[in-house]
């Protein structure tokens, strides 16, 4: 399976880079994983609603340019569908069974995802009703993908 994680903005924090690198290294035994960072749109602190939509639209265009037509897309969003780790593992296994070999997970910037990206998504996923920095979310996602593979192979992993 080929998994792509698309994020808005460049990851700067060393501790997050190290955590993500560890999980992507572990995932190499199970799948092909690729990370794509699209540039975030520079914007002032205070934005009108119209300016916010414009920023999300530009970031969304950059995201959509990285997604092929045969890719199953998950959009990460607070309002997305929540799952247990076991349910997530079952979903990934089912996608592989039905021949969906390319999966992309999309993490938006600080303003969230553009409506166009949400429309392109085949499904949404939420890890919590809480708000997390999008850079931290990338590491949490990598851990959950790794956990899913361990669950699907009946391999031990901390609960």
Swiss-Prot record:
Q: Which GO terms describe its cellular component?
A: cytoplasm
Q: Which InterPro entries match?
A: Alpha/beta_knot_MTases, RlmH-like, tRNA_m1G_MTases_N
Gene3D superfamilies given in the database record:
3.40.1280.10
Task: Look up keyword Endoplasmic reticulum and say if it applies.
Answer: no
- GO MF annotation: an example: rRNA (pseudouridine-N3-)-methyltransferase activity
This entry's Enzyme Commission designation comes to: 2.1.1.177
Does this UniProt record's set of keywords contain Amino-acid biosynthesis? no
Q: Which reaction does it catalyse?
A: pseudouridine(1915) in 23S rRNA + S-adenosyl-L-methionine = N(3)-methylpseudouridine(1915) in 23S rRNA + S-adenosyl-L-homocysteine + H(+)
Q: Which residues bind S-adenosyl-L-methionine?
A: 76, 108, 127-132
Any idea where this protein resides?
Cytoplasm
Keyword tags: Cytoplasm, Methyltransferase, rRNA processing, S-adenosyl-L-methionine, Transferase
Specify one Pfam family. SPOUT_MTase
The entry assigns this protein to a family as follows:
Belongs to the RNA methyltransferase RlmH family.
Indicate the quaternary assembly.
Answer: Homodimer.
PANTHER family reported for this sequence: METHYLTRANSFERASE (PTHR33603), RIBOSOMAL RNA LARGE SUBUNIT METHYLTRANSFERASE H (PTHR33603:SF1)
Q: What does this protein do?
A: Specifically methylates the pseudouridine at position 1915 (m3Psi1915) in 23S rRNA.
| Name of the featured protein | Ribosomal RNA large subunit methyltransferase H
